[in-house]
C-alpha cells in the first residue's frame, strides 16, 4: 500500500477504529541537550542513506507546516535545515547526525505543493521507501498545523501509518499563532476528530519554532528511546 497520494486507497468512512501499535515506553530520567548537529547526507532511497547505523527519528508533514523551522529550533541552529517561503522545498531525504549518537531525518512534505505529476509520484515513492525500509527509524514525528482543524490528507496519512504498524507521534506546529487557551482548544478539537478513527491517541506535543515551546518535551521524549 502506498501511504500518500492526493487520493488514497484507504477510506476513512469504512475504516475500523485503529489501535495505536507503537510500543509504550516507561518514562525514564534523562534530559537531552544537543551539543552538535551536523549534516550527514541526502538521498532518495533508504538504501542510499549514511552507512553508519544509528537510531533515526524522522520528521514529516504537509507542505508549509513549518518542518524546517521546527528542526532548526530543536537543534539550536537556524541554518541547519533550509527554510523557504515556498512550500514543498525539501525534495530529498536529509540526514543530520546529532551528538554523534542518532540521526534526525528531514523527509519531504506530503501534499506536494507546486509539484508536477511526475514529481509527486517520485516524492511519494521516496517517502514510502524510507518509511517502509529504513530499519533504523525509531519514531516518525508527524507535524500538524495547529492553526486549523486537522485535514483529511493528514488523517489519511496517519490512518495508513496505523494500518501498517508504523510508530509515530504528532507535533502540533505554529503554536505561537494562537493564544494558550485557543491552542489547547484546537488540540482537543483535533483529538475529537482523530477519535473517530483511533481507539487511543498517539503521543502529542505542542510546539512553536518562534518561542521554543515544546523543545524540551520533544527532545526528552527522544532521549527516552535512546536510553532503552
Please provide the spans of the model-predicted regions.
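Short, positively charged and aromatic/hydrophobic N-terminal segments
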Residues: 6, 17-23
Amino acid at each position: 500500500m502506498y501511504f500518500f497520494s492526493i487520493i488514497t486507497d484507504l477510506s476513512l468512512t469504512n475504516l475500523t477504529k485503529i489501535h495505536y501499535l507503537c510500543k509504550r515506553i516507561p518514562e525514564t530520567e534523562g534530559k537531552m541537550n544537543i551539543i552538535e548537529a551536523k549534516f550527514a547526507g541526502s538521498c532518495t532511497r533508504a538504501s542510499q542513506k549514511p552507512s553508519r547505523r544509528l537510531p533515526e527519528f524522522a520528521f514529516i508533514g504537509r507542505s508549509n507546516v513549518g518542518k524546517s523551522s521546527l528542526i532548526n529550533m530543536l537543534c539550536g541552529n537556524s541554518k541547519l535545515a533550509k527554510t523557504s517561503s515556498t512550500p514543498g522545498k525539501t525534495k530529498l531525504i536529509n540526514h543530520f547526525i546529532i551528538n554523534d549518537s542518532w540521526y534526525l531525518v528531514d523527509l519531504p512534505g506530503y501534499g506536494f505543493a507546486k509539484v508536477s505529476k511526475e514529481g509527486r509520484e517520485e516524492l511519494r515513492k521516496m517517502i514510502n521507501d524510507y518509511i517502509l525500509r529504513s530499519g533504523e527509524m525509531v519514531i516518525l514525528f508527524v507535524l500538524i498545523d495547529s492553526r486549523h482543524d486537522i485535514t483529511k490528507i493528514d488523517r489519511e496519512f496517519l490512518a495508513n501509518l496505523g494500518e501498517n504498524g508504523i510508530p509515530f507521534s504528532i507535533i502540533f506546529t505554529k503554536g505561537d499563532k494562537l493564544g494558550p487557551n485557543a491552542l489547547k482548544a484546537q488540540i482537543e478539537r483535533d483529538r475529537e476528530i482523530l477519535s473517530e478513527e483511533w481507539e487511543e491517541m498517539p503521543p502529542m506535543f505542542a510546539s512553536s519554532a518562534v518561542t521554543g515551546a515544546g523543545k524540551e518535551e520533544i527532545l526528552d521524549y527522544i532521549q527516552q528511546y535512546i536510553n532503552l
